[in-house]
């Protein structure tokens, strides 16, 4: 097993321990999501966690997409896309950096590999979610790290382009991201934040 693969597997094992907080009120929620939910409830008192809606269905698989959080009063869905499968920012098929990242991921992707899963989620699934949300009239907000959430939370009128904090290229992840994660640091957000990123 390559050293890179060992690092990835250790990161994923550690992530599973954090993501699936069996003692929390919401089984499939990370500590970050629990903290985000607490803050969202201050602005959106009727918000719920782990929500599905008949308007928010994949036209390909006909399965419901899940929202991490949903506020019925403003009809707003929120997703916290911290996992690497979602990339580090929104995929844009017209962005040269995204296209370079796709080529880079494709060069590394093998069947059932992490790179293939990133391609599938970041390039294929997440853009469909955005389009389905738009077509259904659902206001849809995403964050890719805790700093983006906090920046948006303090200025909710900001657009994604105004509150994003991730680097332009995912290729940064090829070495530095996994090295930093191995040292238990979140290179895209504040590694000492109270939400446990």
What are these regions (language model features)?
Residues 2-184, 188, 197:
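Nucleic-acid endo/exonuclease domains
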